[in-house]
Curated annotation (Swiss-Prot):
S-nitrosocysteine: residues carrying this PTM: 498
Effect of residue 527 to F: Constitutively active
Protein name: Proto-oncogene tyrosine-protein kinase Src
Gene name in the database record: SRC
GO biological process: cell adhesion; cell differentiation; epidermal growth factor receptor signaling pathway; immune system process; negative regulation of extrinsic apoptotic signaling pathway; negative regulation of intrinsic apoptotic signaling pathway; progesterone receptor signaling pathway; regulation of cell cycle
Organism per entry: Gallus gallus
Length: 533
């Protein structure tokens, strides 16, 4: 999808320039995570980075083929000068006999080339050689190697990280500016009695001579010098810089080098997390080393050949708000292996103990995260087909990710394919999709409007008191769900935009993301918490 700009007033046309596709994932279910990065199951809180690596095409498990890997776009520039020495940004524990364990701060020499998601490297500390995840390292002495540099994360994502109540005043990060190419932004947590915990953003401008400044009277030859100075003196900032913003370790891109079609024996199913019409979801371990989620499909649910073909597409979808597809067992019963999300499905989360404590700001933020993931799906010209709270997964710190995209198209069960059958999610489905099978990104937008009602009612089934057939008839006649109790009318208006009869008149996900991210500054600045919202 392009990024043509037009006035935000027309939501169906609004386009905003967002970061290019980088890390993305599929699948379905449980791990902690954070903005620009996915979180590993372990709980290390270390600064996140933003190095997107483009999907490679791993071969059958155990095979080696580097001919079809793709150079990481964000690293390519840094490596053009022949950089081969890198520094580890995080600890990494090897998962196979061919990869390399290392500790944060270790220096590593790249042996072959810096392409794809897994690089062959030699540790200058331990003297050992093996494959390393490329998003766990950065060129030595580069800005990317700094703990406080978070790269290409959005203003909203930086606020999500910095607004953690555990962060002291002055917690900070440096990121790329969203609005000025080549400039940076210093984001700092602050506190005052009027606003409470809040974040201030300072544009870091670049001098023609190569230096940097926030205010022209105080200039620095490097970002490192700028950070060191403001760590000692506030000098006009809201507070001096105190702590680097903590976040979780990112997910690796895939389980290991060439671990795509994996043997069933390499997986151990440990805790059953859920069960649906077409299979079960388990927490498990791959190769005795790595926490994963495993979706098992009942034999006959879909053709293994069709699934494998679709999975090749799904694994290339990488975004921090999509659950990452790690690997597959492609013979029946099909297993789908994904990152593990610790809090389970959004539907269960809303209906559970935590749901009672969620208020509109948290719910709107969760909706904005889902819209962000779907805006990426939109840009990639893909369609989800089954967007609802049951297919959104929740991690630590209310991180939400879209799961199970694309799978609905492959289901061969008659109770589903009839579209009016008992297993078909009719209450979430746009009328043109339910009646005529026209599934598009615009039918996903309709489903997102229904998902907004799930959020604002803490998991209530849509169209309460109505059966599927009745829903289809009533919606065709123009019926739309009323505004949920305590929900602002402005949010209900957004739902109704998603439910416009003409699919082309519905908003884009890009517009929905922008609207929801700015909701409490642009639309509802006077919001006051109520009993439930």
């Amino acid at each position: 999808m392009g990024s043509s700009k037009s006035k935000p007033k027309d939501p169906s046309q609004r386009r905003r320039s967002l970061e290019p596709p980088d890390s993305t994932h599929h699948g379905g279910f449980p791990a902690s995570q954070t903005p620009n990065k996915t979180a590993a199951p372990d709980t290390h809180r270390t600064p996140s980075r933003s190095f997107g690596t483009v999907a490679t095409e791993p071969k059958l498990f155990g095979g080696f083929n580097t001919s079809d890997t793709v150079t990481s776009p964000q690293r390519a520039g840094a490596l053009a000068g022949g950089v081969t020495t890198f520094v580890a940004l995080y600890d990494y524990e090897s998962r196979t006999e061919t990869d390399l364990s290392f500790k944060k701060g270790e220096r590593l020499q790249i042996v072959n080339n810096t392409e794809g998601d897994w690089w062959l490297a030699h540790s200058l500390t331990t003297g050992q050689t093996g494959y390393i995840p490329s998003n766990y390292v950065a060129p030595s002495d580069s800005i990317q190697a700094e703990e406080w540099y978070f790269g290409k994360i959005t203003r909203r994502e930086s606020e999500r990280l910095l607004l953690n109540p555990e962060n002291p005043r002055g917690t900070f990060l440096v990121r790329e500016s969203e609005t000025t190419k080549g400039a940076y932004c210093l984001s700092v947590s602050d506190f005052d009695n009027a606003k409470g915990l809040n974040v201030k953003h300072y544009k870091i401008r670049k001098l023609d001579s190569g230096g940097f400044y926030i205010t022209s009277r105080t200039q620095f030859s490097s970002l490192q010098q700028l950070v060191a100075y403001y760590s000692k003196h506030a000098d006009g900032l809201c507070h001096r810089l105190t702590n680097v913003c903590p976040t979780s370790k990112p997910q690796t891109q895939g389980l290991a080098k060439d671990a795509w079609e994996i043997p069933r024996e390499s997986l151990r199913l440990e805790v059953k997390l859920g069960q649906g019409c077409f299979g079960e979801v388990w927490m498990g371990t791959w190769n005795g080393t790595t926490r994963v989620a495993i979706k098992t499909l009942k034999p006959g649910t879909m053709s293994p050949e069709a699934f494998l073909q679709e999975a090749q597409v799904m694994k290339k979808l990488r975004h921090e708000k999509l659950v990452q597809l790690y690997a597959v067992v492609s013979e029946e019963p099909i297993y789908i292996v994904t990152e593990y999300m610790s809090k389970g499905s959004l539907l269960d989360f809303l209906k559970g103990e935590m749901g009672k404590y969620l208020r509109l700001p948290q719910l709107v933020d969760m909706a904005a995260q889902i819209a962000s993931g779907m805006a990426y799906v939109e840009r990639m010209n893909y369609v989800h087909r089954d967007l609802r709270a049951a297919n959104i997964l929740v991690g630590e710190n209310l991180v939400c990710k879209v799961a199970d995209f694309g799978l609905a198209r492959l289901i061969e069960d008659n109770e589903y394919t009839a579209r009016q059958g008992a297993k078909f999610p009719i209450k979430w489905t746009a009328p043109e999709a339910a009646l005529y099978g026209r599934f598009t990104i615009k039918s996903d937008v309709w489903s997102f409007g229904i998902l907004l009602t799930e959020l604002t009612t803490k998991g209530r089934v849509p169209y309460p008191g109505m059966v599927n057939r009745e829903v289809l008839d009533q919606v065709e006649r123009g019926y739309r769900m009323p505004c949920p109790p305590e929900c602002p009318e402005s949010l209900h208006d957004l739902m109704c935009q998603c439910w416009r009869k003409d699919p082309e008149e519905r908003p884009t996900f890009e517009y929905l993301q922008a609207f929801l991210e700015d909701y409490f500054t642009s639309t509802e600045p006077q919001y006051q918490p109520g009993e439930n919202l």
